[in-house]
Structure formats: structure tokens, C-alpha cells
Amino acid sequence: MRETLNRLATVLPRFSSSTARLLALQCALRADRHGQVHLPGGLLRGMRLAGHAVPWQELEHAEWLRCRPTGTGKGQSGVEAQLLDTDTLMPAPARSHRARAAHWALHPVPLAVARAAPPAVRLTALVLAAHTEPDAGRADAETLTHLCGLSQSQLDDLFDRFIRTKVLEAWHCDGDAGEIHWRPRVTE
């Protein structure tokens, strides 16, 4: 997961929204070896993206994918796209591993947040979960801001929000090392 997040942070423009980044992640993990992807309508509704054209337009504008027209018949709901950046697909783990990763990205244990949470919150929780060992996590502050597409102050605000909403038990920034450390809340 970390590798895919890093590749996406590298190829997507810095100004890409959290929504577009979450969408790009699902596309990268669900694409076939030719870069073709179909995101079903149910998945898009679950991600709260059904009917939202802006994140797709962002990814098209970045020349990362091209949306393809889909049929309107029964069973044809969703969006089909062709990924244009084949580097995102290489090296491609087995399809079953990518499918599990795509599902985990929707519910990143141990830092899962509500599906109704704003995209920046969901993306940051996912990035933190990908950098969390069983009882603690840490990452370079600059890496986190790059992966989340946020400024340091925005990231600090989200860490504080995770404390208030009981997603995290604690966090601190080691200014000398440039690292952020956190501890997920243990649920019983």
C-alpha cells in the first residue's frame, strides 16, 4: 500500500484533491494489467462519489486517466476508465492482493474513520494506517504532507481531530528528526 501511495503522490499534481487521490488509489488497485478499470456504482456510492464528476475531471486534466462512456443498461452502472500512466501499475502485485488492498483502503484498520468523513480525513487516516505498526506509527512529516496533499498545519489539525474523535490516542512531532509519531486508540 505504501508503494502505491508513494507512486500516486509522485505522479499526481500536488494540487490534486483528496477526493481525486482516493479515487486514483481505487483505480490503481482495481485496474487490470492493461490499465482498464471499472468502478461499480455501488462502490462509488459507498465512497460517496456517485454522480461527482469533478474528481474524474481532475484525473483527466492531470492526464492520469481517460474516462470511457459506459452503457446505460442494467448492470452497467459505474464508471469505466483507462489509466494513462502505466508506471502506476508496475510492478503489479497479484490481482487478489490488489483487491484485498483496495478493500482495506476503504476501511484502513486500525485507523478506520466514518465513511461520511470528509475525503481529506479518510485519505489521511489511510496514509497513517499504512505507516502504522501494531501499536504505533511514525513517518517523515514531509512524506506525510506529500502523500496527503496537505500543508503541515492542515495535517496538524487533522491529527488533533483524530485525537478528539478517538481515532488516535496520542501524537507528537519530533522537530529535530522531522518525524511525526502517533499511537492508535486501542478498542476493546
Report the location of each language-model feature.
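Alpha-helix capping and helix-coil boundary motifs
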Residues: 72, 93-94, 118, 155
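A generic structural signal for ordered alpha-helices
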Residues: 1-2, 37, 91, 95, ...
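Residue-identity detector for threonine
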Residues: 4, 10, 19, 70-72, ...
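Winged helix-turn-helix DNA-binding recognition segment
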Residues: 30-74, 133-184
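Short alpha-helical segments that sit at the start of domains
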Residues: 1-26, 99-130
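Short, amphipathic alpha-helical interaction segments positioned at domain boundaries
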Residues: 80-116, 183-188
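Generic serine detector
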Residues: 16-18, 77, 96, 151-153
